[in-house]
Every structure is written in C-alpha cells, then in structure tokens.
C-alpha cells in the first residue's frame, strides 16, 4: 500500500510510570499534549505519521499508547521496526516506531 504522508512528527520525551494495580504506563502530559495537538489534522483527512524516538527504549510502552489512540478512533494499527502492532498487544517495540493515523 502506498501512503501519501501529510506530516512527520519526531518527538523525544519520556513516559511517566504510575504504580497502578494493573501495572500500566501512563503517557506524560507533554507527550499527550503533542499527540492531541497534531492529531487534530487527522480530521482534515490528512495522512500523518507520528514517530516517537527515545534513547531509553525501556521506558516506551507502545501497546498502551496505541490503545489510547485506538479508543479515540485515531489509529487502527501501529507500525514499528519489528512490524505491525495491534492495539493491546503485549509486545514492546524498539526505540523507534511510527504511528499511522
């Protein structure tokens, strides 16, 4: 499939860890704001790729992020360097991945 990218966003930030009973990671407010800021363009039917890069790949938990955006109706799949990630998968990706909106 061929994609016509509308925009590529590269961010460097960290995720906050909150000790919930289900042991999940919570997106930091900065990352969440950036995601909301740029996903507004998706309502204009533009294709947007969100690339999140972090030197500490251990702090990245893609399934939670993809689940949040999926529940908002923004994405259906995430593409990472190790392949596609469906929402709620338990796989942790590499330090670089893209979210196709």
Curated annotation (Swiss-Prot):
Misc. comment: Partially overlaps LCB4.
Protein name per UniProt: Putative uncharacterized protein YOR170W
């Amino acid at each position: 499939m061929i994609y016509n990218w509308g925009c590529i966003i590269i961010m460097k930030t960290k995720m906050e860890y909150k000790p919930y009973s289900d042991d999940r990671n919570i997106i930091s407010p900065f990352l969440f704001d950036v995601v909301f800021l740029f996903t507004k363009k998706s309502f204009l039917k533009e294709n947007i790729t969100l690339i999140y890069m972090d030197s500490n790949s251990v702090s990245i938990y893609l399934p939670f992020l993809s689940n949040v955006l999926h529940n908002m109706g923004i994405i259906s799949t995430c593409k990472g360097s190790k392949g596609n990630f469906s929402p709620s998968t338990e796989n942790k990706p590499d330090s670089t991945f893209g979210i196709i909106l």
